[in-house]
Amino acid sequence: FVELAYTFLEDELYYRIDNKPMLVLWNAHQLYSKDSKKLYDNIRQRVKEATGLDLYLVARQPNWSPAARFHNFFMTGGVDAVYMDNMFNQMDWARSYMYPQYINENYKYNRQYTLTNYNIDFIPAISTSYNAWMWNGTDRYNVPIQMHDEGLFHDMCNVAKINLGQHPMVIIDAFN
């Protein structure tokens, strides 16, 4: 990990927040520790010793989940920000009819909760579209397809703007 940090984080083109390189912890909810604060402090310390740089740590939270669920993981661990995984990847057809409204309410709750209870910033993430069937059309049949739609993307951009955290940033999740 430290070698990777040394290789990438010192690059002047690497994304930074408050002059700190941003590091996204992809499955932070599965990073188990008896003392999450100590774990994250050790990550920061080891990278600082190797590179001389302070980190801006971002934890990726699973979609459609409440922030309080991760109290013993990254919330008390001291990450700087949280963002939620692709909100289109879910198995509820009812939600798909009003994605912008439902996602806005989810983001609003999580943004306020993380800031009020943990002083952790929130980064909204939006997606341009989503098609789970591209992997296998037989076992993902119950996941709604979200086709490329300029109007929906515009609405999702507005949802992101409404829910910006202390650092105005949006992650565009367009993996498929």
Task: Show which residues each predicted segment covers.
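Glycan-processing catalytic domains of CAZymes
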Residues: 1-176
